[in-house]
């Protein structure tokens, strides 16, 4: 058993969504994908102080002494999976759940509901999701990696957790965007969750359009600058063209 962080600890659970489908598609090359997935996860998480508690198949359980380090590791791992060239053009979709608490430590490792809560946050997500509990969100504050924002999902029901949990999603530039909504349902009396989801989708579309427009404007400015530079070098030709157009 490794030396475990104690006191206030942030847990991260992760797994690969659709691993059975990947196995069917890739056959013998599936082992290559899982080996690379494990390498990417271990490199990013241990680099930021994560302690590997357990792993099984494509799933991991890490512990961190600081919530900010856990978030940074999760972000970098998601971006690394997006950048990786996978066999046969497949996409490896990783979901993660982060929760911070003050767990008890027994002879076999961590004990208590804090571990369960982090695990349930992971399984509440779909591939590409990084979900935070309210405690982790509060500890991270504004100390987010560049290109990362936090979107509140409101209260959600997590399996085996009696009270609803306020859940937050990391929106990460340069990572694979989730293709499915969060699986955990809101409380039965929350009538606004569909409206919240629609507003969130609208915000994503608006952000995508804004990035596209900004990129187009940058290209236009670049083209105009190039034309201006060319005109400065050949003023006579430009003047002749203007005269012809008259």
Regions found by a protein language model. Name each.
Residues 19, 105, 175-177:
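Short, acidic Gly/Pro/Ser/Thr-rich loop/turn segments
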Residues 27-31, 130, 214:
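Alpha-helix boundary/capping and short turn/kink residues
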Residues 1-75, 79-80:
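Catalytic NTP-binding/metal-coordinating core of nucleotidyl cyclase/transferase enzymes
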Residues 2-6, 13, 17, 24, ...:
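A near-ubiquitous, low-amplitude feature marking generic local secondary-structure context
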Residues 1, 128, 135-246:
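Intrinsically disordered, glycine/charged-rich C-terminal tails and inter-domain linkers
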Residues 3, 15, 28-31, 54, ...:
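Acidic-enriched, low-complexity/disordered segments with a strong bias for Aspartate over Glutamate
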Residues 39-42, 61-172:
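Catalytic beta-strand-to-alpha-helix segment of the class III nucleotidyl cyclase homology domain
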């Amino acid at each position: 058993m490794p030396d475990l962080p104690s006191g206030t600890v942030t847990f991260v659970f992760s797994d690969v969504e659709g691993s059975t489908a990947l196995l069917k598609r890739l056959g013998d090359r599936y082992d290559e994908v899982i080996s690379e997935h494990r390498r990417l996860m271990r490199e990013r998480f241990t680099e930021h102080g994560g302690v590997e508690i357990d792993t099984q198949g494509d799933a991991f359980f890490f512990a961190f002494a600081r919530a900010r380090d856990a978030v940074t590791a999760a972000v970098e791992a998601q971006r690394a999976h997006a950048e990786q060239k996978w066999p046969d053009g497949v996409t490896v979709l990783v979901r993660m759940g982060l929760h911070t608490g003050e767990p008890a430590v027994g002879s076999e490792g961590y004990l208590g509901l804090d571990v369960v809560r982090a695990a349930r946050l992971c399984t509440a997500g779909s591939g590409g999701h990084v979900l935070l509990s309210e405690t982790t969100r509060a500890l991270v504050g504004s100390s987010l990696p560049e290109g990362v924002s936090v979107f509140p999902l409101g209260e959600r029901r997590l399996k085996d957790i009696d009270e609803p949990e306020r859940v937050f999603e990391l929106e990460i530039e340069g990572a694979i965007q989730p293709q499915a909504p969060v699986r955990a349902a809101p409380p039965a009396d929350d009538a606004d969750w569909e409206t919240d989801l629609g507003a969130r989708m609208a915000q994503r579309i608006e952000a995508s359009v804004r990035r596209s427009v900004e990129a187009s404007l940058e290209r236009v400015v670049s083209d105009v600058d190039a034309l201006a530079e060319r005109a400065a070098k050949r003023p006579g030709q430009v003047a002749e063209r203007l005269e012809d157009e008259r």
